[in-house]
Curated annotation (Swiss-Prot):
Modification Cysteine persulfide, positions: C418
Identification of the protein by name: Pyruvate kinase 1
Organism superkingdom: Eukaryota
Pathway it works in: Carbohydrate degradation; glycolysis; pyruvate from D-glyceraldehyde 3-phosphate: step 5/5
Positions bearing Phosphoserine: S9, S16, S70, S213, S316, S450
Enzyme Commission number: 2.7.1.40
Miscellaneous comment as given in the Swiss-Prot or TrEMBL entry: Present with 291000 molecules/cell in log phase SD medium.
Binding sites annotated in the UniProt record for beta-D-fructose 1,6-bisphosphate: S402, T403, S404, G405, T406, T407, W452, R459, G484
Amino acid sequence: MSRLERLTSLNVVAGSDLRRTSIIGTIGPKTNNPETLVALRKAGLNIVRMNFSHGSYEYHKSVIDNARKSEELYPGRPLAIALDTKGPEIRTGTTTNDVDYPIPPNHEMIFTTDDKYAKACDDKIMYVDYKNITKVISAGRIIYVDDGVLSFQVLEVVDDKTLKVKALNAGKICSHKGVNLPGTDVDLPALSEKDKEDLRFGVKNGVHMVFASFIRTANDVLTIREVLGEQGKDVKIIVKIENQQGVNNFDEILKVTDGVMVARGDLGIEIPAPEVLAVQKKLIAKSNLAGKPVICATQMLESMTYNPRPTRAEVSDVGNAILDGADCVMLSGETAKGNYPINAVTTMAETAVIAEQAIAYLPNYDDMRNCTPKPTSTTETVAASAVAAVFEQKAKAIIVLSTSGTTPRLVSKYRPNCPIILVTRCPRAARFSHLYRGVFPFVFEKEPVSDWTDDVEARINFGIEKAKEFGILKKGDTYVSIQGFKAGAGHSNTLQVSTV
């Protein structure tokens, strides 16, 4: 079916299909309890996000504990936990007595890196915590403060600690606000000492993935992997692309990362807002082609922080991110501090179902096969062939037996028009597979039996039963299965078409 035929035959009834796009929700004070987490999971939450820009270790440990408690209360599908790093941000200092100072247009003042002003800022002089700012910026350049609420033009680089600037609009100078230098290559380290401690905390407490903020180069990813160490070798690194450097170096970053987040908030400040649309589509397409999961984030249902219903533009934004190819969509303040967190997750889930119905799966599959460099690995060849078999046989599901989670990721790359049932003995693989579009993970807890054929049959039957529970398969339905010829990772080479 062509894309046009697909669109003209859309079934626009919400809830008429099973959602395949995963939902990430940031947990804050209003949602950090087991009962609310259960409600969020029932509404569609798959991955819990902890924002390490805020909160103590005690607080974040409570989020982890409550997430795990919610699984005891409501087993369902496994829940994944993500740690979002603060990252190498640039921020203003503290104003005197923590007062907000009004700034009129054309107001001239000083930006300084002199530490004596770090806690003594006012409307005449503002401390900035990036020591090299005078080396990387020049007269005429623009500096944004507080997510672009205030704009300043650099009038003069006075000395190695001082900039003279002019306000381009009215606003307020406040404490600890973010500073952006659009179009400027900054040389901040990939990780602050706080970030390193946060990563070690995450490894110790069993997080499944890291959302790495402000990634600029491939070396940044390698630095994070080094800090995670041997104990954290299975933690997935998802890079957040939120500046021009990250966009420019994306191809090299993509080679070494486990996944990508298009973080449109800071990205929309660093580059012209209209360009974010094209960058989003480009980064998602490149991630899809590489078989790496991609998340679309920031302000997706922002109005639902305070309103029970979204704007129509927000619904379209969520839907179009899914049509672009996003594996996951993310909520931030909507679930962290919003008045309607469960409504927000429900709205996102319902929107995802409708958007997925608008996808022309077969043309997408053909595009992916044609654009993927050859030869592919044995595992990817089997994965692509399984998806082809789904289209040929009109199969209702793909059952994947996997140890490492690689095979379901590659099946997801080719976007079958049916769910992917992952059966694994590895709880971690089950949890991080929520990153992959269409994967429904289940942990098979029985010990392996000595006869390999019997063990494979037991796991496939388990997958069939789980698919029946979710209404994916029924008696007489065709399904495709993928398994290996022996135990362990890297041996998926067998494809089978069967009937329930």
